[in-house]
Amino acid sequence: MFARHPNLLWLNKQLSILHYLCLVFLAVYYAYPLLFGIMPRKLQLEDENSFVIMGVADPQIEGNHKIEANGFFKGTLDLWGNDLFLRHLVHMNQFWGQPDAMILLGDLVSFQHLDNEEFNKRAKRLKKITGAKNFWQVGNSSLPARTFENGNIPVWTIAGNHDIGYGCESSDAQISKWEQAMGPVNWVSHFNVSKFPVRVIGINSLSLDDVQFYDANPSDIINSKSFSSLGILALSKEARDAWQFLFDIALEPSIPTILFTHVPLYKPANVCVDEPRIVRQLDFRVKSQNHLSYNTTMKIFELIPSIKLVLSGHDHMGCDYEHPNGAIEHTLPSAMGYFGGNIGFVKLIATNDVLTESSKNTPSVVTFLIQKLIGQRWKKASLKQSKFSSDIYATYTLSHGGPSYIWWALHISVCVLTILRLLVISLQHI
């Protein structure tokens, strides 16, 4: 029949080529985490001696304000599309990386002054996006072993400035709204990597700088009665709660620790895209900030010197930094937006019985591997080494899926080309 319609035959061939190319690109896009070394754990020798944490920063889920600004149809369609893309990012990386736990590093919603009803709606959408039945209700809890095998991994949450506001905006109402939907703002949890214990701490970083520091000669922390002995004057209940929480943690036995914080720790200028800046009100409470202050950062490390790794958000472009005390901080770039599509992985691996002979003979018994992207060039950057503990080494990998328009372009192209090919084929019967 196409012989009678040579133009249709030519058109069908061109559409077929484009169609198959789009299908190939789409298949590659759904396997893109493999390009960054995110692969099924059963293919890796250290499977039984590792613990994997998947990090998502700054999704900033929108809601009613988008609909009010753009109209019901356009706003609803936009929200649906954003949720669909974010769910794709999370589930594809979860499928390939098989994490034991997930951490949402703050700015989970787009506006800190939502009423309870709207906030709960967005929290419900976030559960659907992440696949969480409930956000992990941590206290001083321990995680069950091999949680990824049943697909029901714990999802930890950290509050960001778009969730509860900066220090001057925090209140009992803001904290209560967050904790009812997302869990505690300050929490600690424990897990084992093989037989070796690891502690993770989540902190309300928005209130940590709502303090004034003064000179003090503190006694031994273990023998002190309150954090005031460290020269800290809290300016709000939230700041007092956050610092008291850190002080209580300092009294616990010291084990290797990972700190989760929305606002990154202090770094010198020109290290990250965001400069170390804090804007304060006349009453000294924090109005906005890029990093935690130098004093706050030093006090945290003074209280909990066992912090070896820090994961943070807030700086949408991301940053990697080794603090003077040797702690490594990874600020995850944003999961959404033009610079979005980023998911981070930290894998902690016990050194016992899993290293090859060549690995055992390396200069550093414990290695810290950083696989990082440069912009959107999709290529690996330099490697760095650092020590996590005498029994555990860690790898950090950043998976980059690109902005949402790539995902949409591929899906729409496949749909349009499929329809066009069916239309051309149907024309042969005319």
Curated annotation (Swiss-Prot):
Major place of residence: membrane
Top-rank taxon, per record: Eukaryota
MF term (GO), any: GPI-mannose ethanolamine phosphate phosphodiesterase activity
Single GO cellular component term: endoplasmic reticulum membrane
Membrane topology: Multi-pass membrane protein
Subcellular location: Membrane
GO biological process: GPI anchor biosynthetic process
InterPro entries associated with the record: Calcineurin-like_PHP_ApaH (IPR004843), Metallo-depent_PP-like (IPR029052), PGAP5/Cdc1/Ted1 (IPR033308), Ted1_MPase_dom (IPR033307)
Keywords: Membrane, Transmembrane, Transmembrane helix
Transmembrane segments: 20-40, 405-425
Protein name: Uncharacterized protein C23A1.02c
Lineage of source species: Eukaryota, Fungi, Dikarya, Ascomycota, Taphrinomycotina
